[in-house]
Curated annotation (Swiss-Prot):
Lineage of source species: Eukaryota, Metazoa, Chordata, Craniata, Vertebrata
Localization per Swiss-Prot or TrEMBL: Cytoplasm, Cytosol; Cytoplasm, Cytoskeleton; Nucleus
Protein name in UniProt: Glyceraldehyde-3-phosphate dehydrogenase
Record-listed N6-acetyllysine modification sites: K49, K182, K207, K215, K242
Pfam families, sorted: Gp_dh_C, Gp_dh_N
Organism: Mesocricetus auratus (Golden hamster)
SMART domains attached to this UniProt entry: Gp_dh_N
């Protein structure tokens, strides 16, 4: 799913040239159908067709591979330099490194990784070193939380914090109750329940903002909505600040260094208003509250599919 939406984002922005796609599970005609029609984001606004064994999007012919083993994909022959690894399976340096054997020069893992360096755009992307061949783009929740946490920490200091993400359904969940390994709750029907779940998103912020390492943790509630999630960051501030001061610095960041990554709104918004929004995170000024000048609850929305795909 993220692979398809990264492709949509690439054709929408025009910043990236898609030359090849690997999908061993569906044939070319099915690829056309799945790319063209999307239950959440609507029909693709351009043209898409199958022609001469290639997927043709907006007139651009894309080479198709159907390999289960990434070492067999001839990325180099197709002219691919950067590979987006979005299967959710090959997320370690060793496994993702298989793409390099086929001629790719770099691999971006669209998930958290146990050992690959992790980067969040707008937060620690400037630490990227050109010698790195394999990197992780973290998770959608980390890419929402980290820019907000950075702005707050840079201006007021975060002593400690707890994050809750109210998260839309994703493909790992069950349509009806079913077995789910050791995570029994995760196996309950996604459309019927609010499901408490674990997330490493808050702890991962400590990897991209080292000063916050050990200061944040969090959990998730999976809720029966198809897309768009929201982060609640409740934190203690080092430096006292009125809620108006917080709004001011977030707004400034959204118009300056984090423009396009961190959004800001004072409107009376709800989750559907962020469908297909390309920001990593949009601060909801009207939804947050302060207990006092050192203890605040901050709310930020994200399209967990499309916002994340635009950062990839």
């Amino acid at each position: 799913r993220i692979g398809r939406l990264v492709t949509r984002a690439a054709f929408t922005s025009g910043k990236v040239d898609i030359v090849a796609i690997n999908d061993p599970f569906i044939d070319l005609n099915y690829m056309v159908y799945m790319f063209q029609y999307d239950s959440t984001h609507g029909k693709f606004k351009g043209t898409v067709k199958a022609e001469n064994g290639k997927l043709v999007i907006n007139g651009k012919a894309i080479t198709i591979f159907q390999e289960r083993d990434p070492t067999n994909i001839k990325w180099g022959d197709a002219g691919a330099e950067y590979v987006v690894e979005s299967t959710g399976v090959f997320t370690t340096m060793e496994k993702a490194g298989a793409h390099l054997k086929g001629g790719a020069k770099r691999v971006i893992i669209s998930a958290p990784s146990a050992d690959a360096p992790m980067f969040v755009m707008g937060v620690n992307h400037d630490k990227y070193d050109n010698s790195l061949k394999i990197v992780s783009n973290a998770s959608c929740t980390t890419t929402c939380l980290a820019p907000l946490a950075k702005v707050i920490h840079d201006n007021f200091g975060i002593v400690k914090g707890l994050m809750t993400t109210v998260h839309a359904i994703t493909a790992t969940q069950k349509t009806v109750d079913g077995p789910s390994g050791k995570l029994w709750r995760d196996g309950r029907g996604a459309a019927q329940n609010i499901i408490p779940a674990s997330t490493g998103a808050a702890k991962a912020v400590g990897k991209v903002i080292p000063e916050l390492n050990g200061k944040l943790t969090g959990m998730a509630f999976r809720v029966p909505t198809p897309n768009v999630s929201v982060v609640d960051l409740t934190c203690r501030l080092e430096k006292a600040a009125k809620y108006e001061d917080i709004k001011k610095v977030v707004k400034q960041a959204s118009e300056g260094p984090l423009k396009g990554i961190l959004g800001y709104t004072e409107d009376q918004v709800v989750s559907c208003d962020f469908k297909s929004d390309s920001h990593s995170s949009t601060f909801d000024a009207g939804a947050g509250i302060a207990l006092n000048d050192n203890f605040v609850k901050l709310i930020s929305w994200y399209d967990n599919e499309f916002g994340y795909s635009n950062r990839v």
